[in-house]
Each structure stands twice: as structure tokens, then as C-alpha cells.
């Protein structure tokens, strides 16, 4: 594709809308700024899809990033841009709205990920992750006011190796991985996508001190209606699928009084 314009598809993942979701004004503001920066760098408008995650929830963000990136076949035309910044790296007062730094990686399939390095936002990524030479302060709304030029620059560099990108900083060696037995995502049906490893001796599970017996199966529909089951689900990559806690015909999330990604699932053998 070298020598002609590339059309970029950007998945933009952010924690703006606990109430407003993808309709939050912040998404539109960032989308507009991205379009402006692409034009400034002589590129066509990107196609942008917004995805809202829970406020400050880096587990949910990291899961969404990996699920979309690893399963893509768009290569370097696909950029994942994410912004979930709890600003928990330093609990003292911050100057000039400083927060966690921007980071970048490229997967073997060519998809590039650029976003705030905070908590578990890169916790499912196995490729090398690098700092981006970009300011980490200057605005309360860094995803609109500070980061978009870096995203556009990364796209501009799509035909070249990431190692030659002028904004590439040092490699990050300490990347937190998401713990076992953790809820990673909750879909619209109330199925809980988790990092639980299937084991024959799991007889019940407990979430936030709410306990129910559970069966195991090869799929979420391999039990009668109304039964709670732990089974491989529809999410995952490279042949590895996340186990899901599902209530057939109902909502496991409602049954366990609406846990959130990051909550721990306790496994019981009896």
C-alpha cells in the first residue's frame, strides 16, 4: 500500500461514560481532534469506532484492547487508541494535570496499540511495549488535547517499522498481568468473561460473598435452562478462549448482584 493513501480504522476505547456511554460528548471531541490531526499530517479522515468502558477500569480496558487487536486482520491499517487513566501511579498532588504516560506496541498481525499505560491496560499484551515520547501533562483532557498528534504520527509511520518511529521511547519491562480468577468483561447478556482455568474439582463459585453451585461444560448451552455453568466462551485469541460464568436463560451478572471487571471469583471444591 506504499505510495498511496491508507484508510485507517481506529478503535477508540475510553472510560468517559458511566451514564452516557458512547454518547458522551468527550468521544465526539476526541474524534474531531483525531480527524484534525490526520488532516494536518496529510492523511485522510480515519474511520473511528468508540467503545465505552467503566470509569478507571483498567482490566476491562485491557481486555477490550486485546480482544479487538489480536483478532483483527486489518494489519497496520488498524490502530487501537485507548484512554483509561486512573492516575493511581502517584497518589500525591499532581502538577499540571499530569497522569500515566502514553505507551505503544505492535502485535505480530501488524495492529498497533497506543494508549495510557495504567494498571492492566496492557496486561493481556505479550509483544514488547514502549513509552511514547509525548507529554504526560498539560490538560485534564489529555486524550483530546495532548495525545492525538501522537496517534496521527503513528499512523503516518504505518509503512515503516515501529522501531524507526521518531516518538518511540524505551521499552517497558514491568507490565502487570491480570490475575487468575478475575472477571475481565461482562457482556450484554450478563455473562462473566474470566481468567478462570477449568478444573474438575470446581463445584461452586463465590463473588463478593455471594455463592452458588456451578456446573462445567464444553459450551455455555451444554446445561439445562436455568443452570449456572462455567465453560469456554466466545472471547479469546490465538486458540485460547476465556472461560465464562453464564446463567442459561438468565443473567449471571444479575445473579451475583452486578460485579465489575477486576472483581475476583473464588473457586470452591464443595
Write out the residue ranges for each language-model feature.
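Short acidic-glycine loop/turn motifs at beta-strand connectors
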Residues: 106-109, 208, 270
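A generic local secondary-structure boundary/capping motif
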Residues: 69-70, 91-94, 101-104, 182-183, ...
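A conserved acidic, glycine/proline-rich C-terminal tail/linker
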Residues: 193-260
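Solvent-exposed alpha-helices and their adjacent loops that cap or buttress functional pockets
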Residues: 2-4, 72-75, 95-96, 103-107, ...
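Alpha/propeptide regions of enzymes that mature by internal proteolysis
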Residues: 3-83, 263-268
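Anionic-ligand-binding alpha/beta catalytic cores of soluble enzymes and soluble regulatory domains
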Residues: 125-203
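Active-site histidine-anchored catalytic micro-motif
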Residues: 30, 42-48, 54-63, 74-76, ...
Amino acid at each position: 500500500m506504499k505510495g498511496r493513501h491508507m484508510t485507517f480504522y481506529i478503535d477508540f476505547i475510553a472510560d468517559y461514560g458511566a451514564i452516557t456511554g458512547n454518547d458522551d460528548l468527550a468521544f465526539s471531541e476526541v474524534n474531531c481532534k483525531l480527524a484534525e490531526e490526520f488532516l494536518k499530517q496529510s492523511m485522510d479522515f480515519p474511520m473511528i469506532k468508540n467503545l465505552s468502558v467503566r470509569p478507571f477500569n483498567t482490566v476491562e480496558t485491557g481486555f477490550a484492547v486485546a480482544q479487538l487487536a489480536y483478532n483483527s486482520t486489518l494489519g497496520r491499517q488498524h490502530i487501537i487508541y485507548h484512554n483509561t487513566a486512573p492516575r493511581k501511579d502517584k497518589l500525591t498532588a499532581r502538577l499540571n494535570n499530569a497522569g500515566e504516560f502514553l505507551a505503544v506496541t505492535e502485535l505480530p498481525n501488524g495492529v498497533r496499540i497506543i494508549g495510557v499505560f495504567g494498571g492492566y491496560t496492557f496486561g493481556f499484551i505479550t509483544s514488547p511495549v514502549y513509552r511514547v515520547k509525548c507529554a504526560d501533562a498539560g490538560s485534564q483532557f489529555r486524550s483530546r488535547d495532548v495525545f492525538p498528534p501522537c496517534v496521527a504520527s503513528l499512523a503516518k509511520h504505518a509503512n515503516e517499522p515501529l522501531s524507526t518511529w521518531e516518538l518511540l521511547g524505551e521499552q517497558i519491562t514491568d507490565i502487570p498481568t491480570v490475575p487468575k480468577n478475575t472477571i475481565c468483561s461482562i457482556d450484554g447478556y450478563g455473562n462473566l468473561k474470566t481468567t478462570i482455568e477449568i478444573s474438575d474439582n470446581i463445584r461452586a463459585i463465590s463473588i463478593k460473598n455471594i455463592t452458588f453451585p456451578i456446573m462445567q461444560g464444553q459450551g455455555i448451552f451444554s446445561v439445562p435452562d436455568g443452570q449456572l455453568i462455567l465453560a469456554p466462551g466466545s472471547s479469546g485469541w490465538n486458540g485460547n478462549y476465556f472461560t465464562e460464568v453464564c446463567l442459561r436463560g438468565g443473567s449471571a451478572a444479575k445473579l451475583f448482584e452486578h460485579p465489575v471487571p477486576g472483581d475476583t471469583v473464588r473457586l470452591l471444591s464443595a
